[in-house]
Design a protein with these regions (language model features):
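Short intracellular "coupling" helices and adjacent cytoplasmic loop segments at the cytosolic face
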Residues: 2-5, 105, 113-137, 141-143, ...
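Helix-loop-helix
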Residues: 170-184, 254-327, 332-333
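Transmembrane helices of ABC transporter permease
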Residues: 23, 27-40, 51, 85, ...
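Juxtamembrane loop-to-helix connectors within ABC transporter transmembrane domains
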Residues: 13, 21, 100, 120-164, ...
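Transmembrane helix-loop-helix hairpins at lipid-water interfaces of multipass membrane proteins
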Residues: 28-92, 173-177, 288-292
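An intracellular "coupling" helix at the cytosolic face of ABC transporter transmembrane type-1 domains
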Residues: 23-26, 124-125, 143-150, 154, ...
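Alpha-helical segments in transporter systems
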Residues: 15-18, 26-51, 78, 82, ...
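ABC-type nucleotide-binding domain
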Residues: 341-342, 348-592
Length: 592
């Protein structure tokens, strides 16, 4: 996002947010009732205390004149009554705070759950066009910011507005003239408040954006710190982080600076109100129009009038941050999803594994086609190797087969049915995958292998590990299958990680296998063991193997040679070597 960009739709975002919490409107109504009740009890007290002040001043004057004394009993009753009102006000405030906190946490819980579910339905293109840190920032920072703002802004807004109304009513009962003088400060306060809001709004949005950028950079640097050190890129990373951090600093400073202006401005305006009330009150008291206690109560009301106006200003700033955060979360929730279910889906039961590519055309951007005309027919149980230089489109073909992306033209058929006619989840259950990048999670080795099929028994997990030639090294580890992998998965080697992911794929027992550089991260000895296990595993299953080490796919039934998105050669190893073409050059180059 460009620096200084305003929120796209502040009013619309606030409207969406309040519609989102509509499920809890009964609780919000109760919060409003208790907030207003707390305000009423609080607003009544100054006038009641004014009576005590009047009684005290009259008692002193009578005592000086020798006509009586101070009526402490009457004053004591007033003070006890006020104490009761304040206790009720605090009790009501506690109840509304308790309920509102519960509502806020439920909203945040629901939103996190919906975001988590949404992420599972998002297309691969969404994640490949954004950093992980930026996506995570919306789930953590933005939802937390929204929750904090929601918890404080609703109750404070209700309390502030009801206080202003209540105070003005009570002031009118004392002196309409003094009320008019006091209320004249409100337009000044509102104009100053709107000026500050207008200035700060865009910076709050920018601040939230760059928090996401910071998280993304930190995640990338932390995840790739070995590569950064190996290439001596610490200074470059530091410079890039400094630039992003500098932008965040400036936007945060400006937003907080304008936000901080609110209180001193409102204090200045409030002090003007005090001066005006003191002068007009003194003049009215001299004329005998009002009593001393009324002036004391009125001054309290003036203070109570400026304070909620300040609170409204603070709430507005809070709502700016809340809206900026909520807007980013709603943007994620409103992103286009993958179509998970189709009408009259084809069943995946009894899938044999016949795969046909019919003139497939694809580009990550519609104006940059990388696969121009891909056609191939794979019979059930055949082993298909896809080879070619980097960028030829090998991995892209796998993504299309799994429907991580949909083709721009042509079709991919599974057992004669267009893969778009299957429910996406059921289609992906057909495929077992071992990717270039190993993905394991914090937990035991047994749990990581069982991820391939959650209902598998311990014996089945161990059998899969043996088939992947992982049983020996697992048994030698402290705790064996119950050894806990740490959060960074650094307590086993890269080759061992690869073996575990292969064991997971074996356990899943899918009819079609996809091995994307499955042996590229292991040493030659381990590669031979894995290759023997893979040969046994692939018997009777349609298998797609992507490998740079051409020696590993010599026994493939079909080898598809890709270059610049097209198949330029196909056949088995002997046929392609006899052609003495591009494949032969690739193969010979690895042995030269």
């Amino acid at each position: 996002m460009m620096g200084g960009e305003k929120a796209k739709d502040f009013k619309g975002t606030i409207g969406k947010l309040f519609r989102y919490i509509g499920k809890y409107k009964a609780a919000v109504v109760v919060v409003a009732i208790f907030a207003i009740g707390s305000t009423v009890f609080n607003v009544v007290c100054p006038k009641v205390l004014g009576k005590a002040t009047t009684a005290l001043s009259e008692g002193i004057m009578n005592k000086i004149a020798g006509n009586g004394g101070i009526d402490f009993t009457y004053i004591g009753k007033i003070l006890l009554f006020c104490l009761g009102l304040y206790v009720l006000s605090v009790a009501f405030s506690f109840v509304q705070g308790f309920i509102m906190t519960g509502v806020t946490q439920k909203v945040c819980y629901r939103m996190r759950r919906e975001v988590s579910e949404k992420i599972n339905r998002m297309p691969m293109s969404y994640f490949e066009s954004r950093t992980y840190g930026e996506v995570l920032s919306r789930i953590t920072n933005d939802i937390d910011t929204m929750g904090n703002g929601l918890n404080q802004s609703i109750t404070q807004l209700i309390t502030s507005v009801s206080t202003v109304i209540g105070v003005i009513v009570m002031m009118l009962t004392i002196s309409p003239l003094m009320t008019l003088i006091s209320v004249l400060i409100l337009p000044i306060s509102i104009m100053l408040m709107m000026f500050v809001i207008k200035k700060s709004q865009r910076f709050f949005k920018q601040q939230q954006e760059y928090v996401g950028h910071i998280n993304g950079q930190v995640e990338e640097v932390y995840g790739g710190h070995n590569v950064i050190k190996a290439f001596n890129k610490e200074n470059d990373v530091r410079r890039e982080f400094h630039e992003t951090n500098e932008t965040l600093y400036k936007s945060a400073w400006k937003s907080q600076f304008f936000s901080g202006l609110m209180q001193p401005i409102m204090m200045f305006v409030g002090n003007l109100g005090y001066v005006a009330v003191a002068i007009s009150g003194a003049a009215l008291a001299i004329r005998g129009t009002i009593q001393i206690g009324d002036i004391q109560a009125f001054i309290q009301y003036v203070k109570n009038l400026t304070q909620p106006v300040q609170q409204v200003a603070q709430v507005t700033n809070m709502m700016q941050q809340m809206a900026a955060a909520a807007e980013r979360v709603f943007e994620l929730l409103e992103e286009k999803e993958e179509e998970q279910i189709v009408e009259n889906p084809v069943s995946t039961e009894g899938i044999k594994g016949e795969v046909t590519f019919e003139h497939v055309k694809f580009g990550y951007n519609s104006d940059q086609i990388i696969i121009k005309d891909f056609s191939a027919h794979v019979k059930p149980g055949q082993q298909v190797a896809i080879v070619g230089p980097t960028g030829a489109g090998k991995t892209t073909m796998v993504k299309l087969l799994m429907r991580f992306y949909d083709v721009n033209g042509g079709a991919i058929l599974l057992d004669g049915h267009n893969i778009k006619d299957f429910n996406r989840r059921e289609l992906r259950d057909v495929f077992g995958m071992v990717l270039q990048d190993t993905w394991l999670f914090k937990g035991t080795i047994m749990e990581n292998i069982r991820y391939g099929r959650l209902d598998a028994t311990d014996e089945e997990v161990i059998a899969a590990a043996k088939a992947a030639h992982a049983h020996r090294f697992i048994s030698a580890l402290p705790g064996g299958y119950n050894m806990e992998l740490n959060e960074e998965i650094t307590n086993i080697s890269q080759g061992q990680k690869q073996l575990l992911t292969i064991a997971r794929a074996i356990l899943a027992d899918n009819p079609v296998l996809i091995l994307d550089e499955a042996t590229s991260s292991v040493d030659t000895r381990t590669e031979h063991r894995i290759q023997r296990a893979m040969d046994n595993l692939m018997k009777g299953r349609t298998s797609f193997v992507i490998a740079h080490r051409l020696s590993t796919i010599k026994n493939a039934d079909i080898i598809l040679v890709m270059k610049d998105g097209d198949i330029i050669e196909q056949g088995n190893h002997d046929e392609l070597m006899a052609q003495n073409g591009f494949y032969a050059d690739l193969y010979n180059s690895q042995w030269s």
